């Protein structure tokens, strides 16, 4: 339940809420007002070790619980999430800043991930082939791997943790969760509801904190696998450090998602799609559209409509249903984003919509409005870097081939979209674009939870993505059995 009092956040270890053994804390402000709403502990290594010990002890019994019984617990958890979805959305808006509409959408996507986890009995089924030789049968069995950990970002404080621990736990593992210290309140509520669903103590443990918690997770010998979502430099570090310590690691990283706009697109729907992809959630998502490659033939018309519609967007507190763009997560991030806008101007791009100029009525929050640049090229930082904000760059290209070439020159390859009514264009795009997730007239090509989620190149470090059968394979190990009976 949301209150006005400043909350002191705790860890959850072995079924109990406990104070961190450390003394260092970090203030958690409401991004829309700057007012402090909580203090989160920056837990030391000792807290991680206690959480791992609890998870390791719980694994001995939880891994032996029949798979259907594990799923029944998750059905109860799913029901509790559905019953509390309005409260969960409000917590997200309070501590993350995204609009209540965006937060409600995130809650639904998180619930869908838990729905996937409830189907684990089907997803964990192995394979069998009788009589591979005279009197000999062969089969593959899947087993849990032990204690696993998840490190999640601030931008989707519900959806991304729910990509991880429900599926891992359904597969018979136990879990140590480290969510972003910027959004600790939603993590607390997720854990509360988890134990209301009747799970045994120690199956899920929550350790709040920063880099010390991350390093402790990566170095702990009893953690078998680590799931991570965050920025590219940190993802690279997590992957390299975790694998060096013998862990299975999936690290989902940054993005610079391109959308190619063809002359045969549906102009109205394309403009609205680009606006939604670029500016919803304040652009703080790894699937946001941050570059539009528009073909010359339609460029002027597309840009005129895009600019006119973007200027209608209201900026402000996410609890106000009239607002489309909420605050950024922190003042430091706001200053970083303003630096990118200034660099775009200095590099010669044309600033068509200036998000630095927003109504003073938004108050003391960390606001930057929707921003659009035209005349961008590959030498500019605003094209090269992940800005993670409502900043959209437009590059004019002569045709589809040039648009694909431009997109593939980015070091990132998370998502890519084409807007077209031509099936051949869509096919050419699909076959030649380098991206892990592709959309054809789909604004945000984030797949449903029963498909894998992962990018290519600097957008992903690892082999198996999150969700779907990839997720089950990541959280289990195979045993191949060849047997003969006399």
Curated annotation (Swiss-Prot):
UniProtKB keywords: NAD, Oxidoreductase
Alphabetized CDD domains for the sequence: ALDH_F6_MMSDH (cd07085)
Coiled coil: none
A single GO molecular function term of this UniProt record: methylmalonate-semialdehyde dehydrogenase (acylating, NAD) activity
InterPro entries: Ald_DH/histidinol_DH (IPR016161), Ald_DH_C (IPR016163), Ald_DH_CS_CYS (IPR016160), Ald_DH_N (IPR016162), Aldehyde_DH_dom (IPR015590), MeMal-semiAld_DH (IPR010061), MSDH_GmP_bac (IPR023510)
Documented EC number(s): 1.2.1.27
SUPFAM superfamilies recorded: ALDH-like (SSF53720)
Pathway: Polyol metabolism; myo-inositol degradation into acetyl-CoA; acetyl-CoA from myo-inositol: step 7/7
Self-association state and partner proteins as the record states: Homotetramer.
Biological role: Catalyzes the oxidation of malonate semialdehyde (MSA) and methylmalonate semialdehyde (MMSA) into acetyl-CoA and propanoyl-CoA, respectively. Is involved in a myo-inositol catabolic pathway. Bicarbonate, and not CO2, is the end-product of the enzymatic reaction.
UniProt xrefs under NCBIfam families: MMSDH
Record's protein name: Malonate-semialdehyde dehydrogenase
Gene that produces this protein: iolA
């Amino acid at each position: 339940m949301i209150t006005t009092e400043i909350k002191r956040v705790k860890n959850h270890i072995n079924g109990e809420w406990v104070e961190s053994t450390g003394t260092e804390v970090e203030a958690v402000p409401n991004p829309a007002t700057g007012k402090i709403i909580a203090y989160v502990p920056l837990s030391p290594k000792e807290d991680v070790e206690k959480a791992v010990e609890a998870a390791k002890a719980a694994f001995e019994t939880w891994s032996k619980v029949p798979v259907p019984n594990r799923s029944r617990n998750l059905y109860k958890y799913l029901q509790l999430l559905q019953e509390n979805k309005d409260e969960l959305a409000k917590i997200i808006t309070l501590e993350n800043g995204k609009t209540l509409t965006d937060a409600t959408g995130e809650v639904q996507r998180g619930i869908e991930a838990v729905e996937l986890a409830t189907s684990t009995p089907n997803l964990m089924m192995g394979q069998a082939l009788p009589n591979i030789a005279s009197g000999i049968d062969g089969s593959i069995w899947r087993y849990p791997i032990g204690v696993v950990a998840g490190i999640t970002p601030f931008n989707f404080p519900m959806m991304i943790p729910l990509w991880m621990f429900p599926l891992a736990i359904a597969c018979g593992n136990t879990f140590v969760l480290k969510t972003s210290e910027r959004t600790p309140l939603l993590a607390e509520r997720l854990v509360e509801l988890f134990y209301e669903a009747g799970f045994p103590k120690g199956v899920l443990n929550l350790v709040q904190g920063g880099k010390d918690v991350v390093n402790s997770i990566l170095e702990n010998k009893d953690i078998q696998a680590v799931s991570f979502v965050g920025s590219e430099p940190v993802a690279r570090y997590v992957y390299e450090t975790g694998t060096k310590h013998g862990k299975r690691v999936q690290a989902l990283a940054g993005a610079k998602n391109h959308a190619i706009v063809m002359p045969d697109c549906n102009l109205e729907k394309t403009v609205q799609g680009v606006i939604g992809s670029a500016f919803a959630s304040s652009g703080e998502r790894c699937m946001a559209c941050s570059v539009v490659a528009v073909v010359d033939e339609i460029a002027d018309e597309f840009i005129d409509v895009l600019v006119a519609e973007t200027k209608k967007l209201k900026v402000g507190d996410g609890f106000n249903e009239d607002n489309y763009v909420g605050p950024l997560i922190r003042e430091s991030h706001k200053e970083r984003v303003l630096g990118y806008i200034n660099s775009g101007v200095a590099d010669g791009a044309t600033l068509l919509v200036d998000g630095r100029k927003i109504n003073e009525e938004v108050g003391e929050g960390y606001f930057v409005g929707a921003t659009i640049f035209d005349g961008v090229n590959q030498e500019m930082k605003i094209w090269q870097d992940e800005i993670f904000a409502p900043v959209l760059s437009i590059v004019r290209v002569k045709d589809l081939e040039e648009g694909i070439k431009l997109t593939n020159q980015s070091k990132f390859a998370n998502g890519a979209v084409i807007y077209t009514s031509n099936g051949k264009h869509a096919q050419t795009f699909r076959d030649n674009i380098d991206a892990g997730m592709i959309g054809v007239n789909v604004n945000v090509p984030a797949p449903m939870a029963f498909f894998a989620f992962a990018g290519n190149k600097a957008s992903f470090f690892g082999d198996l993505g999150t969700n779907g059968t990839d997720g089950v394979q990541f959280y289990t190990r195979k045993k191949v059995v060849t047997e003969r009976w006399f």
